[in-house]
Amino acid sequence: MSDINATRLPIWGIGCDPCVGDDVTALLTRGEALC
């Protein structure tokens, strides 16, 4: 979980947009599930 949070904050820069951040987290989680 820490890796996902650390990845989305600096790279995506969505720290100030919780809604989009949640969507990105969901996409990353689904991607990991597919792998």
From Swiss-Prot:
The keyword Transcription does not apply. InterPro entries: Amanitin/phalloidin. GO terms for molecular function: toxin activity. There is a cross-link at residues 11-18 (Cyclopeptide (Ile-Pro)). Residues 1-10, 19-35 form a propeptide. The typical symptoms of amatoxin poisoning are gastro-intestinal distress beginning 6-12 hours after ingestion, a remission phase lasting 12-24 hours, and progressive loss of liver function culminating in death within 3-5 days. One of the few effective treatments is liver transplantation. Belongs to the MSDIN fungal toxin family. This is Beta-amanitin proprotein. It comes from Amanita exitialis. The lineage of its organism: Eukaryota, Fungi, Dikarya, Basidiomycota, Agaricomycotina.
